[in-house]
Amino acid sequence: MKYLPLIIMVIVAYFIGNISPATLIARFYGIDIKKAGSGNAGTTNVLRVLGTKAAICTLLIDVFKGFIAVSIAQGNFNNLGAMLAFAAVVIGHIYPVVFKFKGGKGVATFLGAAMAINWPSMFAAALIAIVVAAISKKMSLGSILAAMMYPLLMLYYYPKAIPIAVFMTFVIIFTHRGNIKRLMKGEEKELSIRSKIKKLRDQLDDAENSEKIETDCSAVSENNNVVEKAAERSETSPEETKPEESSDEVIDATT
């Protein structure tokens, strides 16, 4: 029974991983993310289908859930507990029982969990992913190379976690097996992050311009109302101020 708390912790970490912001955010927009784009419930596909804002929200939530699951394990168990939570939360993201075992590829959750284990190695892996993705315009290539470098980074920063680092590297490579085939055939889609950021800026500019136009229209409408009221008053004022004829003037007029 002494392992029961550890087992419960692993189950909790798995269900934390089941939280799928990509699926939930896409549903908010009336879209089934598994039937749109690449069909993957992850940040990259959300970026393609829903844009930068939704992708940023997806990324942050996926990273946070990996971080929080491993942090809870670290606070209550030893290094073994943290490594088991690492594996559980990422596998929970990839194979979520609440979404019929159809999840994402686990990269963002992997980074969040890695940050809780050892943040310098996580930031080094993230930097590798960003640089490779920016140069190649292929997010999958950046993710794969970052995962492959992760055990070497852990060997330098935190040797105790080498076993989980190697295991999670194989997990991430396995989830990207389709991408690897397309990369080898030269068929992997490019993803221009710059164009997405430019599109987001354009959307923000359009929103600001629309807000200004609405404000100007409201001001013009108010001015028109004031002018109309003034015109109505000017039309009715002569009748209201017209003096009544005296009875003597009426008699004189009749005679």
Q: Residue spans of the language-model regions?
A:
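Long, low-complexity, intrinsically disordered segments
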Residues: S218-T255
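Short, non-helical or kinked segments that cap or interrupt transmembrane helices
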Residues: D32-T43, V98-L111, K138-A146
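Cytosolic, membrane-interface loops and tails of multi-pass inner-membrane proteins
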Residues: T23-A54, K181-K199
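Loop-to-transmembrane alpha-helix initiation sites
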Residues: F123, M139-A146, Y156-V171
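Interfacial segments of multi-pass membrane proteins
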Residues: L47-L50, A73-F77, A88, G92, ...
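N-terminal signal-anchor transmembrane alpha helix
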Residues: K2-F28
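Nucleotide and nucleotide-moiety/phosphate-recognizing core
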Residues: P5, V10, A54-V97, P120, ...
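Alpha-helical transmembrane segments of multi-pass membrane proteins
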Residues: A13-N18, V89-H93, A129, A133, ...
